[in-house]
């Protein structure tokens, strides 16, 4: 699925049970995760139903146990796993995929590293109808000005192609840096 399609679904309030977001361009991964984090639950629901975990600190068993909980006074809960590339026992997610908790939105941020698609878990994630499997590649330098124009248009600003080219040239291809400017 493409970034634009995922964002359109999120804006429409359509959430998948699992999001596996990987790749070298962290801007797209962070943006999708932030949209889920900010919009899937109301402020009141977040206290009990939103959990952010870090791959360095947890095992997959902890992640799946958290995802299997039922939401409290809400329709759903959100579990976001940052630095998921550091989880060693990723294979332990397989039983959860087969028996999902339908009220949970589970988000994995697998940054700056490509998953080994030969492993069973990543094959299962990429082929599962319950999972949005998104891989973001770095944008080529010649695509950055067009991305800047599109980004500005989304934010209701106007920018010329020449100005976008100058911005791209001075800031490079780090989209997070470009978006902050």
At which residue positions do the language-model features occur?
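Conserved beta/loop motifs at nucleotide-recognition and modification sites
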Residues: 1-181
